[in-house]
Amino acid sequence: MTIRPAYRPKIVKKRTKHFIRHQSDRYAKLSHKWRKPKGIDNRVRRRFKGQYLMPNIGYGSNKRTRHMLPTGFKKFLVHNVRELEVLLMQNREYCGEIAHGVSSNKRKEIVERAKQLSVRLTNPNARLRSQENE
C-alpha cells in the first residue's frame, strides 16, 4: 500500500513559462537562461511594454504548496539509512529521494528500511540491478 500525503491541495503556478534572457533569440552565444539586465538604457530592465517580463516576487508560489511535488509530498534528500529515519514522524508530509552518489548496495538497504518505516521514496528503482539468468 502506498503512503498518501496528509494534505494535498491543488498546486497552482502563477506562471509556467520560463523567463528568457534579453536578446538570447538574437545571438547564439547568449544562452536562454535568465540573467538580470544591468544596462542603463535596457528596455527590459525599464519594463517597457512588449518586452520580456522580468521575474519578481509576485510570481512566487503559495506558501503551503511551495516545493511540493505533484504527489503532494515535499522532497528530502537521503544519503544513508540513518538520514531516512528523520522522516519517520514526517512520512505523510515528506518523501525521501535517494541521492545520486549512493551505491547500489546502499540503495537496496535504504529501500528496505523505507518500506519498514513506511516512508515513500521518489526513486526506489533507480540503479538497482537485477541478476540476469545465464
Swiss-Prot record:
Disulfide bond sites: none
Recorded GO MF terms: structural constituent of ribosome
Coiled-coil stretches noted in the UniProt entry, renumbered to this chain: none
Pfam families assigned to the protein according to its UniProt record, in alphabetical order: Ribosomal_L32e (PF01655)
SMART domains xrefs: Ribosomal_L32e (SM01393)
Record keywords: Ribonucleoprotein, Ribosomal protein
GO cellular component: cytosolic large ribosomal subunit
One GO BP annotation of this record: translation
SUPFAM superfamilies from the UniProt entry: Ribosomal protein L32e (SSF52042)
PANTHER family assigned: 60S RIBOSOMAL PROTEIN L32 AND DNA-DIRECTED RNA POLYMERASE II, SUBUNIT N, RIBOSOMAL PROTEIN L32
Similarity comment: family membership: Belongs to the eukaryotic ribosomal protein eL32 family.
UniProt protein name: Large ribosomal subunit protein eL32
Organism: Drosophila acanthoptera
Gene label: RpL32
